[in-house]
Amino acid sequence: MNLKHPTRKDHILIKVVNNLLIDLPTPSNLSIMWNWGSLLGIFLIIPIITGLFLAMHYTPHMNLAFESIYHIMYDVNMGWLIRFIHVNGASFFFIFLYLHMARGMYYYSFHYKEVWLIGCTIYVVSMATAFMGYILPWGQMSLWGATVITNMLTTIPYLGQYLVQWIWGGFAVGNPTLNRFFVLHFILPFIILALSIIHLIFLHSKGSTNPLGMNSNAYKIPFHPYYSSKDLMFLLLLMMIMMVIIFWNPFLFMDAENSLEANFMKTPVHIKPEWYFLWVYTLLRSIPNKLGGVLTMVFSILILFLLPFISNFNYITSMSMINKLLFWSFVVNMLILTWIGGMPVVPLFETMGLTSTFLYFIIILIYSNSFLMINKS
């Protein structure tokens, strides 16, 4: 008797999902550090869905944006919950994104060039999306953050000033800026979603790394039910943690200054972005020259794109003690940069920021080429 194949293997659309998420051959020794990718997918969908409901009640106008946020919080049924899930979900998304990138660096996953480059592109687009979302509540930090960050474009020779005024839609941040940021903040997550699918396709065509860094083609197991059940358990745990934060301290990841309505006549004592951009902000302000600070910030992201091209290695070297020392030094330095970014600009933090900026580039360059150093020693 001929046994009919399951529908998931024959249907022209369902079999694509089946090959990516169900019958996917997966190395049998993946650790919990390989969970972040699936969690990122879930925590990308959550802000998209909640953002759709928020957009139904938000008004992108200078005189109404701040009031519309409070309208959502107080008047819309469960609006407060939708907003807090959206905001804290975005913070969790960036936590998982940094952990996902750190795992990729630790296990030298950037030798999968297409996968790594698309992943870095997703990170950049996510940064742009989150920045625009930070502006929409139209609080004090929203206004002055938009003014400071968009002003960086004035460092572009000849075109800079015109480009800034074109983005603003005038001679200062105003209604046109808010409208444009609202539209882009709505559209960009769908671009991230499309890039994530391409990221998955390239990853599964090349195969994944594993903790040992060895070829795992000899023994693989299907993704479902072995890893899908593990991912689901971890997802439920993290969802519980997020809900505890939402019900206990929903403003944990937010700045208190942004609870004040935007005021062009009053500047905050310390203008700073969301916590997940503080490390980049430290690099920007560590250089006393405006152009130098912007270039430093650009190169800090660009160097991630260049990792597959500047690295010299023949196999995974995450087992090396030198590499472990370099990697964890890099992690500690990133945490220091993040901490300094939230501190006021005083001589002590300026010196620490400049030192940490220098170490950021030095460590990442040595780490990417440490295999050569080991071979030569």
Swiss-Prot record:
Cofactor: heme b
InterPro entries with a match to the protein in the record: Cyt_b/b6_C, Cyt_b/b6_C_sf, Cyt_b/b6_N, Cytb/b6-like_sf, Cytochrome_b, Cytochrome_b_C_euk/bac, Cytochrome_b_N_euk/bac, Di-haem_cyt_TM
Keyword Ion transport set for record: no
Electron transport keyword on record: yes
Binding residues for heme b b562: H86, H185
Annotated heme b b566 binding sites: H100, H199
Protein family according to the UniProt entry: Belongs to the cytochrome b family.
Summary of subunit composition and partner proteins: The main subunits of complex b-c1 are: cytochrome b, cytochrome c1 and the Rieske protein.
Protein name: Cytochrome b
